[in-house]
Amino acid sequence: MLNETYRGMLAHKSVIRETFMYGKQRAAQIGYENVFDYSLGNPSVPCPERFTAAMQELLTQEDPVALHGYCPSQGDPEFRTAVAAHLNRTFGLPYAQKDIFPTTGAAGAIAHALRAVTRPGDEVLTFAPYFPEYGPYVEGTGAHLRVVPPQAPAFQPNLEAFEQMLTEKVTCVLINTPNNPTGVVYSADTLTRLAEILTEKSRAYGHNIFLVSDEPYRDIAFDGRAVPYPAAFYPHTLTCFSFSKSLSLPGERLGYVAVRPGCEGEEVLVDMMAQLSRFTGHNCPPSIIQRAVSRCLDVTSDLSVYETNMNLLYNKLKALGFEVERPGGTFYLFPKALEEDANAFCRRAREFDLLLVPSDTFGVTGYVRLAYCIDTEKVKRSLPALEKLAAAYQ
C-alpha cells in the first residue's frame, strides 16, 4: 500500500520547477536563444578555478582508499575546521570545529536544524514572502509553520505583526537574508529589533526561542553593501549556508549548519544533527567535495555578473512603469505584476516567451519573481519582450 501522505504531495508540485521544465520544452520548439527563462535560481557563472585545482589535487595526490572512504558522521574534520576559521575571520565569533555540521546544501541544513530545535506541536514563524519548501521542512518535524504577513513594498520583516504572533508555542523563527524572492537584505536595525523581541519573549516564556537563519545568498550583495550576520545579533542562532551560489556548485549540494557559540545546546546540537542524518538516511555529503571546498572558502565565483544583470533589468522595469524595489542582493527581482492576478500575468508573459514565477508560490499575491542568473547577453535580448509585455497592459 502506498503512503497516502506523500502521494498527496504530488498535488503540490513546484511552480518554479514546472515553469523551468516548460522552458526546456519551449526551447526545443523555438530555440534556446528565444526563450527568456527567469524561473529557476540556478547559477550561471562557473565555479572558481581554485575549486577545480583542489579537486585535481585530491584526485591525483591523495590515497584513493582514504579519499573515497567514509568520513565521520559529524562531517570531514578538515572541512569543519576550515569553515569555523573562515566564519571567525569574517564575523569575529569564536566558532570551533564542534559547531559546524556539513549538510546536503542549505535545504539539508534547514531540515536538520529544524528537527533539532522543534518538537511535534511546536510552532515555527517565518516572514512572507518566503521560500515555498519551508512548509514541508517544518511540517516534516511535526511542528506547524505560521507566516507573518508581508510589509510591502520594502519587504523588511513586519516586526509589529511578528511580535503579536510570537506566542509561547513558538520555539523557532526561520529567516532568510538576503531574501529569496525579494532580494531584500535585512538591515542591522531590523536584526537588532528582532533580537530584542526574541530575547524579551524568551525571558517571558521561560524558554529560549531559536533563530534558524537561511543564508545561501550571503555573498551576493550589491552597491558595496555589507550583509549583516544574524548570528552576531542573537546568541541562539543556527546559521544555514550553501556553496551552491557563492561557488556556483548547486549540483554538489554542499552546505552546513553553524551553531553559534553560546547557543543553547551548543555542546550537543551537532551530534544530534549527525544522528538525525543517519536515522533519516541522509548521512554526510560526499567527503571529496567537503575537502575540496575547505580549500576554497576565501574565494567566490565572479558574482559581479548578477549585479550587471540586476541593473539592466531593474532600470528597464522602472522605465516601463513597474513598481519594483531595488534589491540589496541575491539574483532575484520582485516587481509588482501589472494586474492583480500574478498567475494570469505570468501566463500573459509566456505569450512573449518570458518565463516568470507568480508570487503566490512565496506566500503573497500580486507580484512576480525574476531569477536573473542567466547570461547577460540573454538578459539584454529579453528587454524587448518586457517592453511588449508592458505594452499589452496599456
PLM features per residue range, with description:
Residues Q61-D63:
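N-terminal alpha-helical segment of soluble enzymes
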Residues M1-I16, A27-L59, Q74, E78, ...:
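PLP-dependent class I/II
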Residues A66-L67:
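Pre-Walker A segment
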